[in-house]
Structure formats: structure tokens, C-alpha cells
Curated annotation (Swiss-Prot):
A GO biological-process term: catabolic process
Positions annotated to bind a divalent metal cation 1: 22, 24, 169, 298
GO MF annotations in UniProt: hydrolase activity, acting on ester bonds; zinc ion binding
Protein family membership: Belongs to the metallo-dependent hydrolases superfamily. Phosphotriesterase family.
Originating species: Drosophila persimilis (Fruit fly)
Protein name: Phosphotriesterase-related protein
Cofactor names: a divalent metal cation
EC number(s) reported in the record: 3.1.-.-
Keyword Metal-binding in record: yes
UniProt remark on cofactor binding: Binds 2 divalent metal cations per subunit.
Length: 350
């Protein structure tokens, strides 16, 4: 019998409810810090406040406080927003912090207990540049053993074993580094054996998702259990998205709430708006891809939490879905993207 593995134990897929498939509640994102523009250096070095928030929104990766998404203030703010998510109808959150991002599994467990929201934790490796020496030298076989242990046996937290429920986010640069090729291969091998869900973070290059899928499929992974994340900053043409869908993976729009067109991590492109995300999802529905679509926010900096003037984890439910309904998207279509698709992706029988 298939089930979903949450940090508090197995549940039947129908208990997930509305699910955010790509979020973070605690992680270290300091590797992606960018020096601030000289004209705004003092504002971006100052503590985040109403007088500096405008600068942080424009240059989110140039505030060291903003990318330190792991201190006590961040954890308190994240908990507040998870409770708001629950209040506004949220059921589950898939926490995508993997090895290299300093995942706080103890905090995730505490959140699940205190808020009533189901949390699914991931295993797997982020990009090679953020790995410590003990992980950077792992072979494919050692990675496979690690992922299997995290899913089948679990990780000890305060005397209890906490199991991961999927492999992700598995991240890579472009061209894909050898370490990352190994992690993708290990992911494919273990997915074939366990049947679990997988989530990939492609680099900001249009070819990256296709190269990842090739490596994953060659290793034996099932496309139907694979999510390609961050497509709203990677593939900008509907034709590209349709081509990727032909490989069988889920297409995930997971930067809802990011409304600043200037994208510091790839200044050669303009970040699309929530309105464009909605428009693209509607076009993909017209292409017959409703059962392959997922939505989330990928919150990973403080300024996107409500305590710092942000939108929180409830943004899709309170702001985006009403706009989609107003444009003709049906309740059944929304339920497919936010309830059924996540449940189908996450459920497996190890």
C-alpha cells in the first residue's frame, strides 16, 4: 500500500491536503551572497527594517542578514508563517533543504508537532560548492547508501528516527559538475529501487533540465516521479516547457511571490511576475499538462516572510488561487495541481 513519509511518520496520501512542493523553513544560503551596489552598501548592511526593506527587495542576496535563514529570528518568523499557512487552508509542506544547505531537521520536526502541518523532508545533495569534505568525496555507491538509509531507516533526532520522504532538492550547476553527476545518478538508481519522489534544481540555463533528465533516466529513475523545479526562471517559452514535459517529469512553478524582475543570480534574464506565472500555467493546462503541474514559493530568504514584510507560505492560497479562479481556472484544476499531483508524486511503497 502506498503512503507518504512525513517527519512524524507515514500517512495515507489523501491526508496531505493542499501541498506546497518546494519550500524551506530553515537553511544556510550565505554561499549565494552578492556584494551590494556601492550606492546602497550602507542600507544593505543595516538590519532589515521598513527604511531598508525596499533595497533588500531589489537586492535580496546582498543583505547578509537576509540570506542567514537559520538564526532564531528566522525560525520564529518561519513558524509564524507556517501557522498562517495552516490557518488559510494549507495541509502539507515539502521541505527541500538537502545536504549542503545545513537542513535543520530538528526544527522541521518541532514545526510539524506544533503547527499540525505535515512536513516531508528530503535527502540528496545540493551543488558541489556548498559540500563539506566528508560529502564532497562520496562515490555514487556511497550516495546511494546514504539516501537509502535516510528514507528507510531515518536520521536520529532526540532519540527518535525521522525518515525522509523524497530525494531533493538535488542541485547542479551548468555544465554539471562531476560530483553533481554522481548525485543525479545515485538519485536515479535509488528511485528505481524505492519508487520515491525526486526533485531537481537545475542551473539557470535552458539546457540544464534536459541534461539532468538524461542522466537521471539513464540511471534508471522514473520520469513520472521526478519534479523539475524553478522553471519560472529557467525556461521562458511554452514550447520549451512542452518539450521538457515530453520526458514525463512534473513541471514546477515555484517562485510565486517573487515580483522583482531584476534577478541577481542571473542578470541576463528578467524574472517573470506572478501574473505571467498564472498565464503560463493556464497555457500549459491548455496543452493538456494539468496532471504534470505543481506550484510553490521556494521561500529561502527572510524578506519573503511576513515578519520581514514578505508574503509568507500562504501567498498562493490567499492571493494566487483567487486570481486564477477569476481568470477561468476551475476548482477541479486547482485541486489537481495543489492536492492530487503532489500526492501522486510523494506516495510510494518502499
Amino acid at each position: 500500500m502506498t503512503a507518504v513519509e512525513t517527519v512524524l511518520g507515514s500517512i495515507t496520501p489523501n491526508l496531505l491536503g493542499r501541498t506546497l512542493t518546494h519550500e524551506h523553513v530553515a537553511l544556510d544560503f550565505e554561499h549565494f551572497y552578492r556584494p551590494p551596489p556601492a550606492d546602497f552598501e550602507s542600507e544593505l548592511k543595516a538590519k532589515i527594517s521598513m527604511s531598508t526593506l525596499g533595497y533588500v527587495r531589489l537586492y535580496p542576496y546582498s543583505s547578509k542578514e537576509n540570506v542567514r535563514f537559520y538564526d532564531e529570528e528566522a525560525l520564529e518568523a518561519a513558524k509564524k508563517d507556517v501557522l498562517l499557512y495552516k490557518k488559510h487552508g494549507g495541509g502539507s509542506i515539502v521541505e527541500n533543504s538537502s545536504y549542503g544547505l545545513k537542513r535543520n531537521l530538528e526544527f522541521i520536526v518541532e514545526l510539524a508537532k506544533s503547527t499540525g502541518v505535515h512536513f516531508i523532508a528530503g535527502t540528496g545533495h545540493y551543488i558541489h560548492a556548498v559540500q563539506d569534505a566528508s560529502h564532497a568525496s562520496l562515490t555514487v555507491e556511497q550516495m546511494s547508501d546514504l539516501y537509502t538509509k535516510d528514507i528507510l531507516t531515518g536520521i536520529e533526532i532526540k532519540g527518535k528516527m525521522v525518515k525522509c520522504g523524497f530525494i531533493g532538492e538535488v542541485a547542479s550547476v551548468y555544465p554539471i559538475h562531476e560530483f553533481e553527476k554522481n548525485s543525479i545518478k545515485a538519485t536515479g538508481e535509488i528511485q528505481e529501487v524505492l519508487g520515491c519522489g525526486v526533485s531537481f534544481h537545475p542551473h539557470r540555463d535552458a539546457q540544464a533540465p534536459f541534461d539532468i533528465m538524461r542522466l537521471y533516466l539513464e540511471a534508471g529513475g522514473r520520469a513520472q516521479k521526478c519534479v523539475m523545479s524553478h522553471l519560472d526562471r529557467t525556461l521562458f517559452k511554452i514550447e520549451q516547457l512542452v518539450e521538457l514535459s515530453e520526458l514525463g517529469c512534473y513541471l514546477q512553478y515555484d517562485l510565486f511571490g517573487t515580483e522583482c524582475s531584476y534577478y541577481q543570480l542571473n542578470t541576463n534574464v528578467d524574472m517573470i511576475s506572478d501574473g505571467q506565472r498564472i498565464e503560463n500555467l493556464m497555457k500549459l493546462i491548455e496543452e493538456g499538462l494539468l496532471d504534470r503541474l505543481l506550484m510553490s514559493h521556494d521561500i529561502h530568504t527572510k524578506h519573503r516572510l511576513t515578519s520581514y514584510g514578505g508574503h509568507g507560505y500562504h501567498h498562493i492560497h490567499t492571493n494566487i488561487l483567487p486570481r486564477m479562479f477569476a481568470r477561468g481556472v476551475t476548482l477541479e484544476q486547482v485541486e489537481q495541481m495543489t492536492v492530487t499531483n503532489p500526492a501522486n508524486w510523494l506516495s510510494f511503497d518502499p
